[in-house]
Amino acid sequence: MAEPEPDGSPVAPATGRRIAALAFPALGVLAAEPIYLLFDIAVVGRLGALPLAGLAIGGLILSTLSSQMTFLSYGTTARSARFFGAGNRTSAVGEGVQATWLALGLGMLIVVVVEAAAVPLVSALAAGGDIATTALPWVRIAIVGVPAILVSAAGNGWMRGVQDTGRPLRYVVAGFAVSAVLCPLLVYGWLGMPRLELVGSAVANLLGQWVAALLFLRSLLAERVPLWVQPEVLRAQVVMGRDLVLRTMAFQACFVSAGAVAARFGAAAVAAHQVVLQLWNFLALVLDSLAIAAQSLVGAALGAGQLAHAKSVAWRVTIFSTLASAVLAGVFAVGASVFPSVFTDDRSVLDAIGVPWWFMVAQLPVAGIVFALDGVLLGAGDAKFMRNATLISALVGFLPLVWLSLAFGWGLLGIWSGLSTFMVLRLAFVGWRAFSGHWLVPGTG
């Protein structure tokens, strides 16, 4: 029997079925973009090395900017879920309204700044020359999609908060489907379309992103909640966003440093590092879907004032995530002699890939716990602690070992030791926080 909320309506128990119902659509949303990007790369790649290099530079700019704004999704989920748990759907959706205004404002600001600075920015990243010339038109067009990307992030946030992960999946898939259809037509000039080559990729991306954003906006309008700007709510969202942005920057500093140092050890080392890192990132998305379920359920339980229920959700999601990560670790341990050859047949890369591969396998069970508890604490709105824990883990664990690897020639062993230390430190921090109960703060404040 579910515990009653203040208005008498029940909070759904955190059964395995309920967690899966939230997690699987969330996984679809998380996986849709990487899958489409692979398709985009395959289409553009047939134009040759130069357009592909231009896409890489443009994609780096767009993904870096977008990843810094993930607080529009995660922060909104935490705040919206508390109101939803308290039985106040209007305020829960209202958080989405304010996040959407913030998304539009930040998005337009980013467009103006990047359009003004596009030439020096692209030239700096591409070191000038033909690559910069090729990338520039893509950047100028694709950047206009940033407001749409951020609106979709805000839409994902409030919908997760009201425990609706089905519609976001449909909207995101619809947007990427439009892009996937248009991309080859515009790149190659098929079916009477103009042959735009690399620019066609940017146009296809832009149109698909705005299709998804308009679907999210339509759903927001259908809720018939007040649409005016509420400065006090925006201020609270910006404060939480600041903490989450700093946390994201710590992640990016670590992985950029790791890639830069790996490159110093030769092509085989950096290729092996990149293969395993991309696989690690994909597995992190799989586990992150459970963390999203935790955010929604924990936030709702705390909003309803049901602390015991929030603790139950935390334990159950952590157990599921740990089991899933252990199974994944087992699969990749058993397949260690086979799976790497799926990604490359280069003997030097295969010889180097063993070190990061076994680090990845060993880290997976730790990651299962860490990512689940990340979701619990983010659902509780404990962003300041998450920021501090990530910054300390990066500055004490990951970055020193990465740069010591360069100084002492430790290679991939040192780099991946840094990542493992980073994960263990995060486990210590979030584990302590979870057991302490400091995150169990009831209400909607």
What do the predicted segments below correspond to?
Residues 361-370, 375-401:
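A late C-terminal transmembrane helix in Major Facilitator Superfamily
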Residues 52-112, 151-168, 272-336, 370-381, ...:
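Small-residue-rich hydrophobic transmembrane alpha-helices
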